[in-house]
A protein has these predicted regions:
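Beta/coil-rich, acidic/histidine-enriched accessory regions frequently appended to metallopeptidases
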Residues: 30, 272-470
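Secretory targeting and sorting signals
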Residues: 2-27
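Extended, small-residue-rich solenoid/repeat segments and analogous flexible loops
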Residues: 459-514, 518
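Active-site-proximal alpha-helical
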Residues: 227-307
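Zn2+-dependent metallopeptidase catalytic core
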Residues: 30-75, 79-156, 164-178, 182-186, ...
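Zinc-dependent metallopeptidase catalytic helix centered on the HExxH motif
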Residues: 6-7, 155-230
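Surface-exposed patches in mature extracellular/periplasmic domains of secreted proteins
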Residues: 112-129, 189-202, 222-228, 260-268, ...
Length: 600
């Protein structure tokens, strides 16, 4: 449970513009005897105000009665810098307590009465939620932008920490952080083994808080779409996905039971479960049925076919990096034998657990019948599994083919006149739900490589006369490799930027640098020498990479570094110059054309 809170703090380092939800971290006395007695103050409503002992008795948060304000479900506490009249405080410390409490009460009502997120029971029924206005105190450490959850020392009361600017009218941060409070209060103060506290649930906390905020403000945001849509192949529970992978929730809500499909996961979870295991259990599904359901969701990702599409598509069209992320809808495949229609997914882009690949196809003719022989490279240790099917699109409207989960199977799909866009969608659907933590990244996650032969269509990029799409979003195609380069960036002609790689922002890239796969350089980063950036890696603004450094997998780097191989996001590793992390995925061979013969 507390590991979830610590994780949020770690991930704050690398959020792209998203306000992270870090549960309040408190100083812990060594023994219970050192803790002052908890004090329950008088309340203005039925719920009590509870001030945690480490805030009150040892002065960690030196609150004062004349710097508080209460409503039915919340108590606001602020620091000395805002004084007793914060509406007239200096600008940096100025806020309106009445407005913040009004926002919070409306959010509370929405989550409780409209979403029916959780019953008003346990600690939620006993105590008002503590809301600390940060950056207004004289003591150090109270400087969070926005954080939510509960006070972790005694686990009695929900808590939000938020800066004045983050709590302005219409605050997304308040909606997101109160979402975290509700999540934790689904199980705090209740007996039994309930609660999404397994490490594999870590990403789902942020996924859910973002989704909850979207219900309040449907046109106000849609999460970190750039990271998610650039890394759709990574595991569903990847930390790279935690603000953007809410679309699976939306699919389940749309098709399988409304909002209750989402809230039941939180209210009926067991503390040993991955959220998808909870969903499987409470809906009485087999693992195969769960896998098919998630594969159908992946098919919907081709056109983002959801009931709230009109609200979030503007964010997809204008997201950070839209010029290169939206240039291609899907991933490339490599030709094993183009003449026989034999292709393979690059190993680095093979889907992990409930990640997926969208492979755009060019039909041989209008109304073509497409035949496919799919074969996965199975690993007993991984419990390998795949689910795959076709999607045809005409005038923006999708039509879905049946999903197959055969590891060595043949399927066909009859296109209709006018269906010029066709996709093969392959989802990693293992035989069991693995419990990856959010920071158990690329080298610790199983990937599920595969090959296929196809007739009646050709993967886009391999057809005769192929032409790249026009470069959009203020960028151009780099002459050496064909990747997308921001017009503001400085990229030498000697630098290789692969067909699907990108250099974004005002970055400077020189020397013999290679940027490959779906990797990208971001912000004002500098990359030089013989550096290789590959797979799903990101070089963030502030980085200055040189020498023979290799950055791959799902790694991100934002610091100066000149040596080492980094294949997994690890905020504690820094620049140590060492070799790459050991990958649990083993090498495999290549199937013959005969093994992939299309026989029906």
């Amino acid at each position: 449970m507390r590991s979830i809170q610590r994780l949020c703090a770690v991930l704050a380092i690398w959020a792209l513009g998203a306000a992270l939800a870090v549960a309040p971290a408190s100083a812990r006395p060594d023994t219970a005897a050192q803790r002052p007695t908890a004090r329950v103050a008088s309340a203005t409503a039925e719920k009590a105000v509870y001030i945690p002992t480490n805030w009150d008795g040892i002065g960690e948060l030196p609150w004062a009665r004349d710097r508080t304000k209460e409503s039915a479900n919340f108590v606001l506490l602020w620091g000395e810098k805002s004084g007793t009249d914060p509406k007239n405080a200096p600008e940096d410390y100025r806020f309106d307590p009445d407005d913040i409490l009004s926002q919070l009460e409306k959010l509370y009502s929405f989550y409780m009465d409209t979403m029916k997120f959780t019953p008003e029971a346990g600690q939620l029924a006993k105590y008002k939620i503590d809301v600390v206005i940060t950056r207004t105190w004289n003591v150090p450490g109270l400087d969070d932008w926005a954080a939510g959850g509960y006070e972790e020392l005694e686990e009695k009361v929900g808590a939000i920490k938020i800066a004045p600017a983050a709590a302005a009218p219409g605050s997304w941060g308040l909606a997101h952080e109160l979402g975290h409070v509700f999540q934790f209060l689904t199980y705090l103060g209740k007996d039994g083994d309930g609660g999404l506290t397994d490490k594999s649930a870590q990403t789902f906390y942020e996924t859910s808080a973002e989704y909850m905020a979207m219900q309040v403000y449907p046109d106000g945001g849609a999460g970190d779409l750039s990271r998610f849509l650039r890394t759709e192949n990574l595991a569903y529970s990847s930390g790279r996905h935690q603000y953007g992978n809410w679309m699976l929730v939306q699919y389940l809500v749309d098709k399988y039971g409304g909002m209750k499909a989402f809230t039941d996961i939180w209210n009926q979870a067991k503390n040993t479960e991955h959220p998808l295991e909870t969903y499987r259990r409470i809906n009485d599904l087999t693992q195969d049925q769960l896998n098919t359901r998630i594969a159908e969701y992946a098919q919907h990702q081709v056109t983002f076919d959801y009931s709230n599409r009109g609200h979030f598509m503007p964010f997809i069209n204008n997201m950070h990096g839209a010029g290169f992320i939206n240039a291609y809808n899907g991933v490339p495949v490599k030709a094993v034998n183009r003449r026989t229609g034999h292709y393979a997914i690059p190993d680095a882009l093979a889907p992990s657990d409930y990640g997926y690949n969208k492979i755009k196809l060019v039909p041989a003719r209008d109304g073509a019948r497409i035949k496919l022989h799919f074969k996965g490279h199975a690993s007993e240790a991984a419990g390998s599994g795949w689910s795959y099917g076709f999607v045809a699109v005409k005038d923006g409207t999708p039509r879905y083919g049946a999903v197959s989960s055969s590891p060595d199977g043949q399927i066909s799909f009859q296109t209709r006149p006018g269906e010029k866009e066709v996709y093969l969608v392959v989802t990693g659907t293992p035989k069991t739900v693995h419990h990856y933590g959010s920071l158990d990244g690329y080298t610790k996650n199983h990937r599920y490589p595969y090959e296929f032969r196809i007739s009646g269509a050709t993967p886009s990029g391999h057809e005769p006369g192929y032409k790249k799409p026009a470069a959009k979003g203020g960028g151009h195609w780099h002459p050496n490799g064909g990747g997308w380069v921001d017009d503001r960036a400085k990229v030498a002609s000697t630098v290789y930027v692969g067909p699907r790689a990108a250099v974004n922002g005002e970055s400077t890239v020189t020397g013999n640098v290679r940027i490959e796969g779906l990797a990208w350089v971001n912000g004002d980063a500098k990359v030089s020498g013989d550096v290789v950036v590959k797979d799903n890696a990101i070089v963030q603004g502030g980085a200055d990479l040189s020498g023979d450094l290799v950055l791959g997998g799902d790694a991100e780097m934002w610091i100066p570094c000149s040596a080492g191989t980094y294949l997994m996001f690890d905020p504690d590793r820094g620049c140590d110059g060492k070799g790459g992390e050991t990958d649990i995925n083993l090498p495999h061979g290549t199937f013959t054309d005969k093994e992939l013969a299309i026989t029906r």
